[in-house]
């Protein structure tokens, strides 16, 4: 399992990205390349509005390196993960912090995000790993529903009983999809229900 890297998707520091790649290169020289390498990437690679983002470019370069360098691999692309984390750079943590501290933030009007519970990611991943047919694939583990940013913020406002203060910014991309066809059976096997209350229940679980 290789689960290290730049944690801030807004990072633009080239030195950090070079360090990230060097770490993987060094790691690849120390392990048996016939073993399956599990790497966590990002579903944001599917979002055309972010294809020039340095963080996204770095993820793509690493994915390509893995595909060329390892005989066996499984690349898991993840959306916005919700769980117990002190990383203030994650989208949900960012919104909760800004709203609770009554700080103004920019709200991207056109942006859409898939949000999933880390526990559900774990369940789906375990189910996938039990099937070796998934070796040498790139798989999205995501909630099929993409929520608008203003909807996510409205749920947080409802849960915290606080009013968010933000500036509307005409950014983001609405017309992009996350292909979850490779995890449909796993979702059924794990009995995960991405229903209309999913987002609110997940946010309540970790933040309220």
Positions of predicted regions on the chain:
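Mid/C-terminal beta-alpha module of Rossmann-like enzyme folds, strongest
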Residues: 131-180
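Short-chain dehydrogenase/reductase
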Residues: 17-18, 52-63, 89, 114-115, ...
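Conserved Rossmann-fold NAD(P)-dependent oxidoreductase catalytic core, especially the SDR/UDP-sugar
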Residues: 24-56, 74-77
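Amphipathic alpha-helical segments that line or abut small-molecule/effector binding pockets
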Residues: 119-130, 200, 204
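Residue-level signal for the nucleotide or nucleotide-sugar donor/cofactor binding architecture
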Residues: 90, 113-116, 144-147, 178, ...
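Amphipathic terminal alpha-helices
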Residues: 193-208
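NAD(P)H-binding glycine-rich loop region in Rossmannoid oxidoreductase-like domains
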Residues: 1-22, 29, 43-49
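NAD(P)-dependent short-chain dehydrogenase/reductase
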Residues: 64-113, 118-122
């Amino acid at each position: 399992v290789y689960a290290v890297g730049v944690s801030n998707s807004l990072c633009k520091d080239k030195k950090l990205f070079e360090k990230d790649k060097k770490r993987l290169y060094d790691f690849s020289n120390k392990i048996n390349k016939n073993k399956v390498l599990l790497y966590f990437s990002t579903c944001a690679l599917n979002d055309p509005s972010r294809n020039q983002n340095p963080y996204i470019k770095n993820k793509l370069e690493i994915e390509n390196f893995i595909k060329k360098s390892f005989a066996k691999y499984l690349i898991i692309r993840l959306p916005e993960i919700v769980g117990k984390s002190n990383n203030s750079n994650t989208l949900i943590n960012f919104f909760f912090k800004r709203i609770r501290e009554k700080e103004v933030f920019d709200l991207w009007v056109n942006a859409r995000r898939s949000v999933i519970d880390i526990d559900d990611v774990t369940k789906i991943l375990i189910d996938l790993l039990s099937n070796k047919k998934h070796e040498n694939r790139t798989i999205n583990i995501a909630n099929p529903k993409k929520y608008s940013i203003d909807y996510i913020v409205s749920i947080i406002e409802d849960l915290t009983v606080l009013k968010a203060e933000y500036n509307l910014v005409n950014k983001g991309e609405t017309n992009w999809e996350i292909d979850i066809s490779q995890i449909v059976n796993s979702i059924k096997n794990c009995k995960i229900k991405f229903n209309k209350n999913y987002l609110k229940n997940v946010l309540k679980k970790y933040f309220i």
